[in-house]
């Protein structure tokens, strides 16, 4: 009996679909979180720009932090894509593991971007009236950013499980 690659129960032909889905979801959801954070905090920055233009540069911190979220998704997507090859056998375990990596970093960055956007918008508006709030706002932004970092760390740990 001739064995074909698709006859392997542990590496069916549809297994790479889950890996590609994980790669795509890591980028899509992370960039969506970055876009939400940038848009929401950008509204606040545009609002204070007409009253106090000198505060705009200090108020860009939420936008920069939101952009970093997309980098988290990019790192995980590149690692997942590096494990995909048309010539090597790809198991269903690796497919599900890569899907969970993408979902983990994607949803973590999505929620982080939403939090950064809300804190950035309200924080920038209140900072215009009370400059002493700056340190507190930055601390809250850091805690919001760390949510996305946690998702990336878990995705990296999961990704190493497939390489063993």
Curated annotation (Swiss-Prot):
It is found in: Vacuole membrane. Proton-conducting pore forming subunit of the V0 complex of vacuolar(H+)-ATPase (V-ATPase), a multisubunit enzyme composed of a peripheral complex (V1) that hydrolyzes ATP and a membrane integral complex (V0) that translocates protons. V-ATPase is responsible for acidifying and maintaining the pH of intracellular compartments. SUPFAM superfamilies: F1F0 ATP synthase subunit C (SSF81333). The lineage of its organism: Eukaryota, Fungi, Dikarya, Ascomycota, Saccharomycotina. The keyword Transport applies. Gene3D superfamilies: lithium bound rotor ring of v- atpase. This is V-type proton ATPase subunit c'. Residues 38-59, 120-136 are cytoplasmic. V-ATPase is a heteromultimeric enzyme composed of a peripheral catalytic V1 complex (components A to H) attached to an integral membrane V0 proton pore complex (components: a, c, c', c'', d, e, f and VOA1). The decameric c-ring forms the proton-conducting pore, and is composed of eight proteolipid subunits c, one subunit c' and one subunit c''. The record marks 145 as: Essential for proton translocation. Belongs to the V-ATPase proteolipid subunit family. It comes from the Eukaryota. InterPro entries: ATPase_proteolipid_c-like_dom, ATPase_proteolipid_csu, ATPase_proteolipid_su_C_euk, F/V-ATP_Csub_sf. It is a multi-pass membrane protein. Its main location: membrane. Residues 1-16, 81-98, 158-164 are lumenal. GO terms for cellular component: fungal-type vacuole; vacuolar proton-transporting V-type ATPase, V0 domain. The gene is VMA11. The chain crosses the membrane at residues 17-37, 60-80, 99-119, 137-157. PANTHER family: V-TYPE PROTON ATPASE PROTEOLIPID SUBUNIT. Keywords: Hydrogen ion transport, Ion transport, Membrane, Transmembrane, Transmembrane helix, Transport, Vacuole. It holds the Pfam family ATP-synt_C. GO terms for molecular function: proton-transporting ATPase activity, rotational mechanism.
């Amino acid at each position: 009996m001739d064995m074909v690659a698709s006859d392997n129960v542990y590496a069916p032909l549809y297994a790479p679909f889950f890996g590609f889905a994980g790669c795509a979801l890591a980028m899509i959801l992370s960039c969506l979180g970055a876009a939400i954070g940038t848009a929401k905090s950008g509204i606040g920055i545009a609002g204070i720009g007409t009253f106090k233009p000198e505060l705009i540069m200090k108020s860009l911190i939420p936008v920069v932090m939101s952009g970093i979220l997309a980098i988290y998704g990019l790192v995980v997507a590149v690692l997942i894509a590096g494990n995909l090859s048309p010539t090597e056998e790809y198991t269903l375990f690796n497919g599900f593991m890569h899907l969970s990596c993408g979902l983990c970093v994607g949803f973590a960055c999505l929620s982080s971007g939403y939090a950064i956007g809300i804190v950035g918008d309200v924080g920038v508006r209140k900072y215009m009236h009370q400059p002493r709030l700056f340190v507190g706002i930055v601390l809250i932004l850091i805690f919001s950013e760390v949510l996305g970092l946690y998702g990336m760390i878990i995705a990296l740990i999961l990704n190493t499980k497939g390489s063993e």
